């Protein structure tokens, strides 16, 4: 499971030219699931996201988590995070979870974040062609892979 986390002032997702979700301050999280991911990966990544101290304190030191600042989360599925470009110029997505498995993991991930955080957790529409609009704050961008926890 791989996530790209961006601290944002606001972010939104459009599908078919209609805004389907929006946050005003918090974290935009792009998430991709691999063929070997399970509930342990979801738990670990959810804890990491909620505990990451990447919001500034009064001295502009990154000292607060999204929980500390009562931010929001916008979760967007992105299987291309599992791309491999080792061979040739066309990325391979053979490490990405099959859509039916990834959808279950995506739904469980959102439920887990809502349960653990109590924050507003918005999401894109899994499998849709989405247009993501965001205003980076910093910018602060963090990449986490659950396979690196071992």
Ranges and model annotations:
Residues 1-88, 92, 100, 104-150:
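N-terminal, polar/charged subdomain of small-to-medium soluble alpha/beta proteins
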Residues 95:
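An anionic oxygen-ligand recognition environment, strongly enriched in 2H phosphoesterase
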């Amino acid at each position: 499971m791989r996530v790209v986390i961006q601290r944002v002032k606001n972010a939104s997702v459009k599908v078919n030219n209609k805004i389907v979700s929006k946050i005003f301050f918090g974290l935009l999280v792009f998430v991709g699931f691999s063929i070997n991911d399970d509930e342990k990966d979801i738990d670990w990544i959810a804890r990491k996201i909620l505990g990451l101290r990447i919001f500034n304190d009064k001295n502009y030191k990154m000292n607060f988590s999204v929980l500390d600042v009562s931010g929001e989360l916008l979760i967007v599925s992105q299987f291309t995070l599992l791309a491999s470009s080792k061979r040739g110029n066309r990325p391979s997505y053979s490490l990405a979870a099959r859509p039916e498995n990834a959808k279950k993991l995506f739904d469980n991930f959102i439920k887990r974040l809502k349960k653990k955080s109590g924050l507003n957790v918005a999401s894109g529409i899994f499998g849709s062609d989405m247009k993501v609009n965001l205003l980076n704050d910093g910018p602060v961008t963090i990449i986490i892979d659950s396979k690196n926890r071992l």
